[in-house]
Amino acid sequence: MERKAMSEIFFFILGIINSIILITIFLIRKSNLDRLQRYGKFYFLLVFPAAVNMFLVFHENGDTRYVIFLALFLAFLLIEWLYDYKFKIGFRENWLKNWKWTIPYLGLYYASNYGFVIMPWKTNITWGIIMMCLFVIQIITNIRSHPRIKS
């Protein structure tokens, strides 16, 4: 059995935490927007473990793809913060009307989640399956939590 690098284990754990937090956010969003406004900003604390994970990858001379996917994740967190807290852009309410804001957001969302599935998958198939299942749950809760667009 091959020993896994600390950065790979850390990345897998970060992916699990990210998915669980997003699933929780989507579930809260459906029922209690006030609570989401109060507690949703704690999601941004994932910046710190992501930065530590980047350091671990560099320290271990790890796979550069981890750094790329971590950078995409950090970019996603940045755009999420800018849209929701800095500029207060309500692009989620009508993403067809606000497509210029939605496209980069969704691109980074899917790219970072792709990384959280594919990188653990290449390390350990069980890890990959766990991450894929969490991502599917994330997508389902995301779709169900957002209002339907009225034409």
Regions found by a protein language model. Name each.
Residues 51-61, 105-123:
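Hydrophobic alpha-helical transmembrane segments in multi-pass integral membrane proteins
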Residues 33-36, 60-61, 85-97, 143-151:
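A cytosolic-side transmembrane-helix exit/cap motif
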Residues 1-2, 22-27, 49-58:
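Membrane-embedded alpha-helical segments in integral membrane proteins
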Residues 23-25, 83-87, 111-121, 133-150:
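Membrane-water interface at the C-terminal end of transmembrane alpha helices
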Residues 37-67:
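Membrane-helix boundary elements
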Residues 35-46, 70, 93-102:
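Cytoplasmic-side transmembrane-helix entry/capping segments in multi-pass membrane proteins
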Residues 71-84, 94-117, 127-137:
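Hydrophobic alpha-helical membrane segments
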Residues 6-32, 135:
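N-terminal signal-anchor/start-transfer transmembrane helix
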